[in-house]
Structure formats: C-alpha cells, structure tokens
Amino acid sequence: MEALALPERTGGFANPKSSTGRIDVFTRVITDFGVEFDKAPPGYKGHLYLEVSPRTFPVLVRAGSRLSQIRFRRGNPAHSDAEIKRLHQESALVDGRANIDGGLALSIDLAGDKQTGLIGYRAKRHAGLIDVDRVNALPMNEYWEPIYNHGKNQLILDPDEFYILASRESVSIPPTHAAEMVPFNPLVGEFRVHYAGFFDPGFGAGLEGKGSRAVLEVRSREVPFILEHGQVIGRLIYERLTDRPEVLYGKSLSSNYQRQGLRLSKHFIQE
C-alpha cells in the first residue's frame, strides 16, 4: 500500500514491529530492484512489498494491518563505543554497570520473578489463529507454556522452538536518541534473538531511573543450546536523532510496552 520518494541522502531501514516479532512472525520489506531485504537505498522512489512468514502460529492479516516499521537515516548516525559511554554518563542507559564493547551489552534474566520464579514463555504448537489487529483478545494459556526457574538459573533451548524471555538489565533510551539491537552474532550462540530490533526515543525513560526491560524473541537453531543467567545475548547501538520528537514513546502514545517486564504481545489477555 505504501510507496517511498526519498531524498538523495536518505535511506530507509525496516524491521518487524514488536507485536509482530512476539508472535513469531518474521517480515521482510522488499523494494523494486533491491539487493538487500529491509533496506531502501538513498533516493529510492518506488513501491514497497512485504514478505510475511508466520513460524509458529497461524495469523489473520488484512489490507492495512501494520506488521513492519521503517526508519529513515541520513549518513551514519550510529555512535561509537566512546560516544555511548559518554551518553551513559550523561543519562544512565541501563541500571547497574554498563558493558560497552561493540555496543551496549544486554544479558538474559534466568533468575526469574522473585515471587513466582517465572523466567519466560515457550510457544505452543498447533494453537489457534491470531488476528493481528485484535488487542487483549486471546487467552495466553492456549498459546504459551510458562517456564519457571527451578533453582538452576539456566534454560535449555530446544531446536526450532520459540521463546519469550527478558533482559536482566532495564534499558532507557534518551529522547534525543533511538537504538537498535545488533543483528545476530554467531559468536553469541546458536540461536536468534530479537526479530523486532528497534527501540524508540523515550523507551524506558522518565521512569525514575528504573527503565524498562527488553523483551526478547528467541529461537534456537538445529541443536539444543544452554543459556545461563547473565549470558550476553545482544548489543544495542545508539543513534542520535536529527531532532527531538514532539511526542515520545510512553503514555502519550498509549505505547503497549512502556514500563514492561516480561510481557507477551498485545494480542493476549494479561494481568
């Protein structure tokens, strides 16, 4: 439905939306005569096409359903490690010590909730249809199996299963910046983390320094893989915006995932 007419120095970069990634739907944006997925080259003028690949759940989409999002970049706004360290000194990007090496490291929380021990969810196979446009509509226990910590602080990822987990750190994105999860690094492990890698300006900010935890979409590859509590699973790259947005991520936008802990997508009924 959409088309682009970009200035000569501005390119587009797409990702699945958070609610799309959290139901294990993988999307890729394609351009006319494009050589890469999810990228519109600077100056691109033409249509956009969307490849939609549900992995676990059958989904219902219709004309106008919003599955992906796009950002526009001019030049190279990504910060170096030195710039990220300076930004962290000005406004804490995570609670506790910041591990900055090729971006800001995020690690996995497998200790779980202090009261319940809940550490995440595993998607159930052969569950019902998900209408991507319906919010707070589905009983979570029909689609997800809760996973608890039984004292080992670890989790074995089964091959080709899909998990929702959370970062140990709480993250803040200053209003002047956005962030993106670095694409899968094979040195981290034999699994994929985070289909929807965009963190909007204001995410986790203004919450009395507490931030919001990153909810992670995790899929193992062909072999079982053991995750340990505190293991690094990805890194955030921060990018400076051309201007501060008039409206930030949060209450004013009715954002679904501000102040989030471990949270499923907006399609499910949650307490």
Go through the PLM ranges and name each one.
Residues 1-271:
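DUTPase catalytic domain/fold
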